A protein has these predicted regions:
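Short, intrinsically disordered N-terminal pre-domain segments
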Residues: 1-30, 480-482, 486, 495, ...
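Short hydrophobic/aromatic-rich beta-strand motifs
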Residues: 29-41, 336-338
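Short, surface-exposed terminal/edge motifs of secreted or surface/virion proteins that either
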Residues: 36-57
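C-terminal, surface-exposed recognition/capping segments
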Residues: 64, 247, 269-302, 344-353, ...
Length: 524
């Protein structure tokens, strides 16, 4: 060892011996907002962080994904916020299938077997024990923002600091991806049954017993308003595919899987960070000669149940009249939700496109609970304008959860990968959105597909509308982090308790460096 090296070693030894344990340090007298701590960042390097911000971040976790819009890839460039929260987000939100009563009380089904409850007792999906629904079991906040060329989508259980957020109460929609009609009582359901009372399609009994049977299928061929009317007969909080639910599926898929392309191939393994990757496969989007079935449903409501609350795809074989195979239909499943895209179009309620001479303006209803007159835009909220030309979607707006395209110019393998269809040049007036495409639309028919050509009295054999419910009440609106008096009391109580825990935790550590995650591990 050289003399210079020896001098430096002695200096380090002297500094080490002069160091103090945290419990031996003088009590700080400055403002918490001015204090800083050393943290170990995700890149493994030591960084500095404001103490007050660190406490807030630990208490109000947020997670999301971001896309670099300087390139056209549909895959996220990275994750935002808490990696651990992102890993656990499906569990945290309670994503999966439940049996739901008309008063909206719900009981969780076994995540691997939907014919029994979580406690192991038998469950029936025929409506006798409740409606078979896919739910997010707790409310959450959503925000989107842009920094430079980076576009962020994030969720949290509390308002995201400094961002405009939309609060989404707990709710759910039909686990089947479509609604089933109780033909006896004229009420929209979500059940799995081959009984004539729940015959699908247009209720054509002449198809019973044939290869084109509509027994056990979702209902189609009804007017836009009727789906809603029959759903609302269940009571407060029920409707048919309210636009919020459509947005929830899109948002959560993008954030959890890190892709805007739901039709990307299924990848069973998680990535190196323990996050979901890939997509849900092609779905039921490329059936040949569908006209032989009259464009009615071909995949029964029982298909896909075997995956439980899983993600991926399963296969249902569509047979010809002679019993031979016609088409191996792929059924995509998103944490138990069947057909988030493909098979049969979904009509979206609560959202109107006003197609005028010069522009097409999109409006949303401010509340599911209030009266909604779809013959007028009076009382509705303008959220965006959509393109006046059809094409693949390059940009979308999620302002107030409208989930509508604002720019085209992509392809089937870039940006959002899905198509926007409109006909403003030849037709004007109020229009509704069809989403998810059908069994004919191939690669352009993913969850983000938007079809804006249908009037309010539109009826089609290939259009469905899933039953939906929402818990809580209140209007759609942006929220910033404003504390009520009660919220201030709760926040003050949390700060006192958390800071007390922090002090006790720090006093136990006889080290000069503190890992950020270790430091806050005991905060709760």
């Amino acid at each position: 060892m050289t003399s210079d090296q020896e001098t430096r070693v002695l200096a380090m030894l002297s500094a080490f011996e002069a160091g103090k344990k945290i419990s031996e340090l003088d009590t700080a007298s400055g403002s918490v907002s001015d204090m800083r701590i050393e943290v170990l960042d995700t890149d493994g390097e030591s960084k500095v962080m404001n103490l007050s911000e660190a406490v807030t971040t630990a208490a109000n976790a947020v997670c999301g994904r971001y896309w670099n819009e300087s390139n056209s890839t549909y895959r996220a460039a990275g994750y935002h916020g808490s990696l651990d929260m992102l890993r656990k987000l499906p569990e945290l939100l309670g994503l999966g299938c439940y049996l739901v009563q008309d008063d909206r009380t719900r009981r969780k089904l076994d995540p691997t077997n939907h014919y029994r409850f979580e406690d192991g007792t038998p469950a029936k999906l025929d409506g006798t024990m409740g409606q078979y629904m896919w739910c997010w079991n707790i409310g959450f906040y959503f925000a989107e923002w842009k920094v430079g060329n980076l576009k962020y989508y994030a969720v949290s259980l509390s308002p995201i600091k400094g961002k405009q957020c939309v609060y989404i109460p707990a709710g759910g929609l039909s686990a089947l991806g479509g609604g089933v009609m109780d033909r006896t009582n004229n009420i929209l359901c979500s059940v799995v049954s081959d009984a004539a009372q729940y015959r699908g399609g247009n209720n054509d009994a002449s198809r019973d017993g044939t290869y084109r049977t509509q027994l056990g299928m979702v209902a189609t061929n009804m007017q836009y308003r009727n789906f809603s009317t029959y759903a609302r007969k269940r009571g407060e909080g029920w409707d048919a595919n309210w636009y919020v639910a459509q947005a929830v599926v899109e948002i959560l898929f993008m954030i959890i899987f890190g892709t805007r392309n739901m039709q990307e191939a299924v990848i069973a393994e998680k990535d190196s960070n323990g996050l979901y990757q890939g997509g849900l496969g092609s779905g039921t989007t490329n059936m040949p000669n569908w006209d032989q079935w009259g464009y009615y449903p071909v995949v029964p409501t029982s298909a896909g149940i075997e995956l439980g609350d899983g993600c991926g795809e399963t296969t249902f074989n569509v047979l010809k009249e002679d019993g031979s195979l016609h088409y191996a239909a792929k059924v995509p499943v998103f944490f138990g939700l069947k057909h988030p895209f493909g098979h049969i179009w979904k009509i979206v309620r609560g959202l109107i496109d006003n197609v005028g001479d010069e522009k097409s303006e999109v409006y949303v209803a401010p509340s599911l609970y209030a009266g909604y007159d779809d013959n007028s835009i009076s009382g509705l909220i303008k959220v965006c304008e959509v393109p006046r030309t059809s094409g693949y979607i390059k940009q979308k707006s999620y302002y107030l959860l409208c989930a509508m395209p604002t720019e085209i110019g992509a392809t089937a393998s870039t940006y959002f990968c899905d198509y926007f269809w409109e006909n403003s040049a030849s037709s004007k007036g109020l229009r509704v959105r069809l989403s998810g495409a059908s069994a004919l639309w191939h690669v352009c028919g993913g969850v983000c597909y938007a079809y804006e050509q249908c009037g309010l009295v539109f009826v089609c054999v290939c259009v469905r509308s899933p039953l939906l419910f929402r818990c809580g009440s209140g209007d759609v609106g942006l929220k910033r982090k404003r504390k009520t008096e009660r919220g201030k009391e709760r926040s003050l109580k949390f700060c006192i308790e958390s800071f007390g825990k922090a002090v006790r935790r720090v006093s136990e550590l006889a080290v000069r460096r503190v890992d950020f995650c270790d430091f806050f591990a005991g905060f709760g």
